[in-house]
A protein has these predicted regions:
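Bacterial Sec-dependent N-terminal signal peptides
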Residues: 1-20
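Cationic-aromatic interfacial patches
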Residues: 20-75
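Well-ordered beta-sheet/strand-loop patches within structured domains
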Residues: 20-24, 33, 70, 74, ...
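Small-molecule-sensing regulatory modules
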Residues: 47, 81-82
Length: 368
């Protein structure tokens, strides 16, 4: 049905304007507007057409993207060639097919967007804005042409690994940041996996959540949570020598949780090269993946199937089916470099396509 709708739309667009330069220009601007491309310019000169084509292929940076650690690659030669063809009289229909992404999800969302624009029942302004934002995000992904990409969508609390053509080769539920500690939107690389990681407790969690508990009974609380006290030199400090009455903002130590199945990061951690203390990791509370609302973390991204994800990124089956549950206690952390660092992209698409191929509007708990 989706393909039929797209075919009808494209046929009418081309039939009504074929061979008419003014009509072709109108269709270009109208199509760009329909899929959420801003009105860039008014005259069909080379510079203006180039700007439209660049956004139709590569989109614009999504709103609230806080950090971009991945290099963007835009094929300017391709855009220039398409511009010359358009200005030389090539019909819009043939150019559109070469411009638009062949990603199944993008095609499905484009058809849905066209239906929203002509159907008053479906096409409320909020829905149209949401689908256009998601279409832009998919176009923007074309700037990152790696063989493998890890993509996390915050509203759906899902992670997927896609290939160069956008096909999903792996997916997993995740837990993302809660409204008070949201996961930021960014792009970066995953360079390595840590086996049996320490959890170096963030300062904010130490001050706001842990110190008040520890002060009541330092030895018992630290022992129950497998926490170590570390000084500025990275040395472990005997808790009995610490003045726990020191004001929280002047507390000179950091807390570190020992490795093992009880560690908050679980037994696998995926390092992420960004300015944030944000990474992907296993967890010691896997029951939360069954919840519909998985906006629960302090900002990091907990992965339901970290062993399978690690095997995929490493390129071989290093971790067996029972690896997550048969872990050693107090094992030393070990960092394993990936054969090639993998791009990771954090997005915020309220409207998207789920793993079953259905269009979903997800609970929008916060705006990052």
């Amino acid at each position: 049905m989706i393909r039929i709708l797209l075919a009808i739309f494209l046929f009418l667009s081309c039939y009504l304007t074929q061979g008419q330069p003014v009509g072709e220009w109108f269709r270009l601007r109208q199509h760009a507007h329909d899929i959420g491309v801003d009105s860039l310019c008014a005259q069909p000169d080379s510079a203006c057409v180039t700007r439209y084509f660049a956004q139709i292929v590569y989109g614009r940076t999504p709103r609230r993207m806080r950090y971009q650690g991945l290099p963007e690659v835009i094929d300017s030669v391709r855009i220039a060639r398409l511009t010359r063809q358009f200005l030389g009289g090539t019909d819009w229909c043939s150019l559109l097919d070469s411009l638009e992404s062949h990603d199944r999800r993008y095609r499905q969302l484009t058809a849905y967007c066209m239906r929203c624009l002509v159907d008053d029942y479906m096409g409320d302004s909020l829905t149209i804005e949401q689908v256009q934002e998601t279409l832009n995000a998919y176009r923007w992904l074309n700037r990152f042409r790696a063989e493998t990409r890890v993509i996390v969508n915050i509203p759906s609390a899902m992670l997927r690994v896609s290939d160069r053509r956008g096909n999903t080769v792996f997916s997993s539920r995740v837990v993302v940041g809660k409204p008070s500690t949201p996961t930021p939107l960014f792009t970066a690389y995953i360079p390595s996996v840590v086996i049996y990681p320490y959890w170096n407790v963030p300062r904010s969690i130490t001050v706001r959540e842990l110190l008040p508990k520890i002060r009541k009974n330092p030895a018992a609380t630290l022992n129950a949570m497998n926490l170590q006290v570390i000084n500025a030199k990275g040395q472990e400090v005997d808790p009995k020598t610490i003045n726990w009455a020191t004001p929280a903002n002047a507390f000179p130590y950091r807390l570190r949780q020992s490795t093992g199945c009880d560690n908050a990061l679980g037994v696998l951690k995926f390092n992420v090269s960004s300015p944030y203390d944000i990474y992907l990791h296993d967890t010691n509370a896997r029951q939360v993946f069954a919840r519909e609302n998985r906006q629960l973390s302090h900002g990091c991204i907990r992965v339901e199937k970290p062993d399978a994800l690690a095997n995929l990124l490493l390129g071989y089956a290093r971790f067996g089916a029972d690896y997550l549950t048969s872990c050693a206690k107090n094992a030393s952390p070990k960092t394993v470099l990936l054969p090639k660092k993998i791009p990771v992209i954090i997005l915020y698409n309220v409207l998207d396509i789920d793993e079953a191929g259905a269009i979903r509007v997800y609970r929008s708990g916060y705006r990052p």
